[in-house]
Amino acid sequence: MKIIMLGAPGAGKGTQAKQIAAKYSIPHISTGDIFRANIKNGTELGKKAKTYMDQGALVPDELTCDLVMDRIQQDDCKNGFVLDGFPRTIPQAKALDDALTKIGEKMDYAIDVDVPDENIVNRMGGRRACLNCGATYHIVFNPTKVEGKCDACGADTVLRDDDKPETVQKRLAVYHEQTQPLIEYYDKQGILKSVDGTKPMDEVFSAIVGILGE
C-alpha cells in the first residue's frame, strides 16, 4: 500500500501519516528525515543535497526524487509506505511517477486532508512552543496547566514566527500555487481520496482507515 499524504501546512497530515504507518506497519517517510539521514550517513546523494542546503537553496526536484526513490526501494518498504511532504509540485509528482514506472510500481492512494485556510490560520496561531525544551502546546486543543509556562520544564512558551498569521498566510499562498494542483493531478489518476481535516484527529484517522480498509 503506497500512500501520498496531501494537505496544507497545519492540516495535520504528518500526524495522520504517523498513525497510518503504525497501524499498517509501513514506514512513514518524510523528505526532511531522508535528507537528514543521508547527510548524517555521508552518502553521495546526501553530500549533494547538503551543498544546496548549506547555501539556503532548495534541493532540485531531480535530486529530491533520487533520494526518495532510494529510500522507498529499501527492504522495509516492500509492503508499502506513507510519503509525507513529497511530492510538493507537479514536476516532482511526474518525476516520482516516472521513477516508479521504471521499477513496475505506482502509487495506490493520494489522501488529501482538507482544511479551510481560516481554520489553518486559527489552528497554527494557537500553537505555543517552549523556549527551553521545545515542547509544543495549543491554547485550545492542548493548553499548558499554567498559562504561558511549559508543563515539562516551567520555561516560557511563545508563538513561533512560523506560526504567526502573516507567515502562515504566505505559506498557504505557496501551497495553493505549487501543491494544490496535485489534488487535480491525482484525481485524474483516480487515486485521490479526500477527508475532512476539521474534525477531531481520531475521526479523521477513522475516515482514512475507512478508505484504506482494515
From Swiss-Prot:
Pathway assignment: Purine metabolism; AMP biosynthesis via salvage pathway; AMP from ADP: step 1/1
Domain of life: Bacteria
GO biological process assignments: AMP salvage
Region (NMP): 30-59
Keywords linked to the UniProt accession: ATP-binding, Cytoplasm, Kinase, Metal-binding, Nucleotide biosynthesis, Nucleotide-binding, Transferase, Zinc
One GO cellular component term: cytoplasm
The keyword Metal-binding is annotated on this UniProt entry: yes
Binding site for AMP: T31, R36, A57, L58, V59, G85, F86, P87, R88, Q92, R160, R171
PROSITE patterns given in the database record: ADENYLATE_KINASE
Known EC number: 2.7.4.3
GO-annotated molecular function: adenylate kinase activity; ATP binding; zinc ion binding
Catalytic activity: AMP + ATP = 2 ADP
Protein's cellular compartments: Cytoplasm
Residue ranges of the region described as LID: 126-163
Pfam families, per the entry: ADK (PF00406), ADK_lid (PF05191)
Main localization (coarse): cytoplasm
Binding site for Zn(2+): C130, C133, C150, C153
Annotated binding of ATP, by residue: G10, A11, G12, K13, G14, T15, R127, T136, Y137, K199
Broadest EC class assigned to this enzyme: transferase
Record InterPro entries: Adenyl_kin_sub, Adenylat/UMP-CMP_kin, Adenylat_kinase_CS, Adenylate_kinase_lid-dom, P-loop_NTPase
Family designation: Belongs to the adenylate kinase family.
Subunit record text: Monomer.
Summary of the function given for this chain in its UniProt record: Catalyzes the reversible transfer of the terminal phosphate group between ATP and AMP. Plays an important role in cellular energy homeostasis and in adenine nucleotide metabolism.
Domain-related comment: Consists of three domains, a large central CORE domain and two small peripheral domains, NMPbind and LID, which undergo movements during catalysis. The LID domain closes over the site of phosphoryl transfer upon ATP binding. Assembling and dissambling the active center during each catalytic cycle provides an effective means to prevent ATP hydrolysis. Some bacteria have evolved a zinc-coordinating structure that stabilizes the LID domain.
Protein name: Adenylate kinase
The species this protein was found in: Agathobacter rectalis (strain ATCC 33656 / DSM 3377 / JCM 17463 / KCTC 5835 / VPI 0990) (Eubacterium rectale)
Taxonomy of the source species: Bacteria, Bacillati, Bacillota, Clostridia, Lachnospirales
Gene it is expressed from: adk
